[in-house]
Amino acid sequence: MLKKRKTTVYALGQYLSMSAHKARRVIDQIRGRSYEETLMILELMPYRACYPIFKLVYSAAANASYNMDSNESNLVISKAEVSEGTIVKKLKPRARGRSFPIKRPTCHISIVVKDISLDEYIEVDFLDPLRWSKKLKSKKKYTAMAYHNMYSNGGVWDKK
């Protein structure tokens, strides 16, 4: 009996005090990238949402090295999503005994890190001129490691 090896770990940040829309702008830039490239991007981006996301990515990598004994150079951000949390409502005192409501949005961020060195190999058939001939009894099969969602984020986001 074969047991499937676990290749993904995750880190979850809940009730982070920022808008989900602003966090998604940063998350869309790191999805599908390698761990080291993600850390460089997050250090250089000038947004407030980068620091909590940086901490989550770092935590996910620490989980991967502790739970799976994986190397940081083999890690890829396979899934990163942001969902809206609760809205914290406060009252700000104003003039003449009045108050003004303040809505403070929160969000939940989950980051899934995958170790590509533990992935299964994908069989790739190279085109052989003798592949269709009946004389050839055994086909040559080459295996190459490939990661499907490596470059799926669609380019660099520009600020509007």
From Swiss-Prot:
Subunit structure of this chain's protein: Part of the 50S ribosomal subunit.
InterPro entries registered for this protein in UniProt: Ribosomal_uL22, Ribosomal_uL22_bac/chlpt-type, Ribosomal_uL22_bac/org-type, Ribosomal_uL22_CS, Ribosomal_uL22_sf
Source species: Panax ginseng (Korean ginseng)
Main localization, broad class: plastid
Gene3D superfamilies found in the cross-reference section: Ribosomal protein L22/L17
Keywords, sorted A to Z: Chloroplast, Plastid, Ribonucleoprotein, Ribosomal protein, RNA-binding, rRNA-binding
UniProt similarity note: Belongs to the universal ribosomal protein uL22 family.
Recorded GO MF terms: rRNA binding; structural constituent of ribosome
HAMAP family the record matches: Ribosomal_uL22_B
Name of this protein: Large ribosomal subunit protein uL22c
Role, per record: This protein binds specifically to 23S rRNA. The globular domain of the protein is located near the polypeptide exit tunnel on the outside of the subunit, while an extended beta-hairpin is found that lines the wall of the exit tunnel in the center of the 70S ribosome.
Pfam families: Ribosomal_L22
One GO CC annotation: chloroplast
Subcellular location: Plastid, Chloroplast
Chloroplast is among the record's keywords: yes
Higher taxonomy: Eukaryota, Viridiplantae, Streptophyta, Embryophyta, Tracheophyta
Gene Ontology biological-process entries: translation
